[in-house]
């Protein structure tokens, strides 16, 4: 038995994302006064009282037909079809607007159980005839921001969804447990959402030629070769100097937070847009956060065959030159829209995830260390004593992190550390993941 699904529907800025966050087990949606912040349907585990369910937030819809509007309607329609119950939301402050009437008719034609949720009711509220004209038999007044009215909402939900079919508190959720969290990041319009849609074979995310369609991180649980994967689509990251509006700043912050929580990050690059400093900045940020990284060059089908070899040579040169701290990053060339080479990306993610989790025994580490340091000795210091690295151990994985003991660690140069790291990558087959060294002074400086 699976959890019942509740979908939030309404025009822009009625408070759907605020209620989504209020009912979610953890906050997931960006909230902003600007209408239309939500553009994809978002899923989360929700809870109200003892009742647990799957909650879907949908884009705000209005009456203006255009390419973007049609795609938003498609996202909302899919969420309605999935729903066991619809919470149709309106704004008590603005009252019933023409868009509310149009959307209520749109929702009712699907004959789904529904509740009219009148939001932003910070004071006592009386329903007038305009609310009844929307055609819903259940109406609740709440304030999602302040959490008032949720007990009444709970009672209505239970009345609409029989308890024995709805409450799943003692049933294991197959989505929960260990999973590989993959964040898809990159500059705007690189094809991140198109790539995820191609992988899961569903128009789950809004796509189009407009840059910046995705405004917040969207999580999708998925299975690939018996591996539980959480795919996370993110808003495109631009240079700080070009981010001016507060909403875009929120989106950028949301993306950066998603990277911090990722296991692996796919850096999506547009083959038609030259590799820019911002791409390298994103990659450096991923590495500094200790995440594993796979670089994907999208729209490869649009590059002329005669230019592909030169493109790849220059691309590898730029990556190896500007990201020497993670030599061997997997680079794949794909066409998301044509589904070309997209599964190779997931295979690369699974492989680098294993490397990111790699544990090396202390005996093997020190056998390697003795051989490597003897092959390239550190210079003699004043007094004729040589700086030595005598012993090492792995202290953690994700990323692989090592503690090295030296008689004089402050004299170990960055270039010597790079020598050790690069040699370790080759010796233990660890390409493309951050490797961290910390040095500790031994008690006896003459050892």
Curated annotation (Swiss-Prot):
InterPro entries with a match to the protein in the record: G_ENGA (IPR031166), GTP-bd (IPR006073), GTPase_Der (IPR016484), KH_dom-like (IPR032859), KH_dom-like_a/b (IPR015946), P-loop_NTPase (IPR027417), Small_GTP-bd (IPR005225)
Key words of the record: GTP-binding, Nucleotide-binding, Repeat, Ribosome biogenesis
Binding site residues for GTP 2: 186-193, 233-237, 298-301
Molecular function as annotated in GO: GTP binding
GO BP annotations listed: ribosome biogenesis
Summary of subunit composition and partner proteins: Associates with the 50S ribosomal subunit.
Functional summary from the UniProt entry: GTPase that plays an essential role in the late steps of ribosome biogenesis.
Protein name: GTPase Der
Organism of derivation: Rickettsia rickettsii (strain Iowa)
